[in-house]
């Protein structure tokens, strides 16, 4: 007599498989979307590269700007304290990015949330807007400045870019360029500025009228404190150094 083997019910698929399948489909959609976005961005960058001007004339543009506004070209080495304060505040990864800093761009919205200025635009982008976009900040100008920033980074050495930036910036009170600003505010050449003076000067870059040390000393001191905080953040100064510098007089001569 043949024994009847008990048939086992068919094994059902794990309940998690449909979930995994949905997750896999979602990943594919996301990856395809990101891939498509990357292609569009690269295409837009290629078009931007073709339609924006070359930047071999950047130094001539700086010289023309200084001549138009009565500024003075800087001489000698880039002032060490001014450069350190500027880079800590405006572009702490200068020299290690190709003219655009995606980390900085991602930090900028975070700064709005936490109530601190964490940067965003690089030195090259800011210089591009001043020299080639007449300071415009509309979306088109910002997009072009990204392409121009990469061109500037490829065409010029870091020291040249810093010098052009410091010569092109407006520091308020009719002072165009770091040479005129240092002599106008403090009666000193840029290389002889102390930390207190250099940090006040760099604080003017983003809003020279708002942080005017003559008209708004309290706001200028608050901005100086931010510059000092950034110097501490990047390791140039200790917290004790920053506190001592914040207490130093500025010795303003303009007014």
Locate each region found by the language model.
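Juxtamembrane regions of bacterial inner-membrane/periplasmic proteins
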Residues: 1-255
């Amino acid at each position: 007599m043949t024994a009847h083997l008990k048939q086992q019910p068919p094994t059902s698929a794990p309940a998690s498989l449909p979930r995994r399948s949905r997750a896999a489909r979602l990943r594919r959609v996301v990856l395809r979307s990101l891939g498509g976005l990357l292609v569009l961005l690269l295409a837009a960058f290629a078009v931007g590269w073709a339609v924006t001007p070359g930047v071999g004339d950047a130094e001539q543009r700086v010289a023309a700007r200084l001549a138009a506004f009565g500024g003075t070209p800087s001489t000698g080495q880039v002032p060490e304290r001014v450069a350190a304060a500027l880079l800590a505040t405006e572009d702490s990864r200068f020299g290690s990015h190709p003219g655009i800093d995606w980390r900085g761009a991602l930090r900028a919205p975070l700064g709005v949330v936490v109530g601190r200025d964490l940067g965003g635009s690089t030195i090259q982008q800011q210089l591009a807007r001043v020299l080639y976009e007449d300071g415009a900040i509309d979306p088109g100008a910002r997009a072009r400045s990204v392409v121009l920033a990469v061109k500037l980074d490829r065409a010029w050495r870091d020291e040249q870019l810093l010098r052009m930036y410091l010569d092109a910036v407006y520091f308020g009170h009719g002072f165009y360029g770091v040479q005129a600003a240092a002599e106008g505010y403090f009666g000193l050449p840029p290389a002889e500025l102390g930390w207190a003076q250099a940090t006040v000067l760099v604080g003017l870059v983003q809003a020279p009228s708002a942080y005017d040390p003559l008209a708004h000393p309290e706001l200028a001191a608050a901005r100086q404190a931010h510059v000092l905080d950034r110097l501490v953040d990047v390791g140039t100064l200790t917290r004790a150094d920053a506190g001592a510098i914040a207490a130093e007089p500025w010795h303003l001569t303009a007014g």
